Amino acid sequence: MTAVALTLRTGTADRLAGHVAMQLANLFPDESMDADVDSLLQVVPRALERMRPILAAVRNFDPGHFNHLNSLQYTSFLYLLANERWRAGARDALAERLFCLNRTLNAVDLFYAVELPQVFFVSHGLCAVLGRATYGDRLVFFQNVTVGRVGNESPVLGRDIVLFPGAQVTGNSIIGDRCAVSAGTHVHGLTVPDDMVVFGGPQGIVLKPRRKDYIGLYLRPLND
């Protein structure tokens, strides 16, 4: 997809940084607002660059416009801000406060030290927890989803994965490419081949060949 100029609802990156700083000052005060703005301006441009492939991929988003009042977009943006602060090696409280802000405003647990893929779509992600795991690109997840390690064992998720509401992937599970985990299904310590739909029921886990392009319901094709 050809890159397009990115416009902001706030108009400028400076105003966007000021908006985030005001929320931090009201909910998680620590530094002065001016200090927060200065620190945020170091990471806002990089976070916006990382929003570009997300905006371009998600069907319901305008590829050329970032709207901080769209809670789905803002959830991703706050994670990216905190993650950029972490990547930069800053060990002050700003990344932690941004993480807390995201939890408070959007009720998601996206820890700043967790590396999510280039394209991820938080679709109504209330109470979702995405923890330590290896994530393939183009991930879609819904509310009450849990991904995380058990002890020292962490999941591996392939590309083009959809985690429907209440899905859980834990331990040393391996989920192949283009798979979907159905609502309320807990995958623990299992290997799932490519192109499968995972169902959970009274008889345990059932794997069925995928007959639908689930990722295509939410993300544009790569060649769009």
Predicted stretch roles:
Residues Q73, R87-R138, N144-V156, A167-Q168, ...:
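Left-handed beta-helix
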